[in-house]
Amino acid sequence: MDNFPHWVDHIIAFVFCIAIPLYAARQKSKGTSFIHFSSDQKKQIYISGSFSLFVMGAIVVSVWLIFKRPIAELGLTQPGNFRSWWWLAIIFVVVYLFDTVVSLSSKKGIDDTVENWKKRTPFLPTKNSELPEYFLLCFSAGVFEEIVYRGYLINYCWYLFDGNNYQQMIAVVLPALAFSIAHFYQGAKAVLKIFFLAVFFGYLLIYSGSLLIVMILHFLVDAVGGLLTIKYMKEVQQPGDENNFLQ
């Protein structure tokens, strides 16, 4: 593509690769131990988070279109060459299911996982009534985060490191690293898992030429995570929050 990366792309890449991850790491250092959110507060978080993700994606797509770049290069096209990527998707699903089953296969594992949810991600849903707004957030993350961190930043790094012997690896790993650090509030273990998840997604994009499968998998991972918290995490009731668990 001509005129890529432009100085505008450098600014966008700085924001998503450096500024946001550093901000996330700084927020992590403040700690969020055992904060309680009511259902209404969670729904507000999901809606505002969805809007923020939409803005992120809209900025990237707008810049892409302003410079008249092929939208398919951003990954917004149908996946092709099925034989080259289907196995990668299967491996991802198997690894994810294995990790989930192992984490929740014993009482100690469940207790540790629930304790971590309460400490690191207290905004996750604990009632069925919170699911519509939560699924909206999952959809927004699956679509707009993938547009930014896979479709856009992999392209950016690919062109930035053109001619480098490790071009493909760098193009996948750097956005994956930024994406995982941006989730630093979830703890070091989660950051490591998210990094490998993001690497899988990066290679899925490269081999399939499309973000579609990646978006679907991303949505499902987040959605299943919310369903699991509803199943296993008991909400700490606060005065004025009279909704029953699993309402």
Segments and roles (model prediction):
Residues 24, 28-32, 103-108, 151, ...:
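Short helix-terminus and kink motifs of transmembrane alpha helices
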Residues 10-18, 49, 53-57, 61, ...:
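Alpha-helical transmembrane spans of integral membrane proteins, capturing the lipid-embedded, hydrophobic core
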Residues 1-82, 227-247:
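N-terminal, membrane-interfacial amphipathic/helix-forming hydrophobic leader that caps
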Residues 59-60, 103, 107, 149, ...:
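Alpha-helical transmembrane segments and their lipid-water interface positions
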Residues 39-44, 65-141, 159-164, 234-245:
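Juxtamembrane helix-loop-helix connectors linking adjacent transmembrane helices
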Residues 33-36, 44-48, 109-114, 165, ...:
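N-terminal start-of-chain detector that recognizes signal peptides
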Residues 13-22, 123-247:
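Transmembrane helix-loop-helix hairpins at the membrane interface
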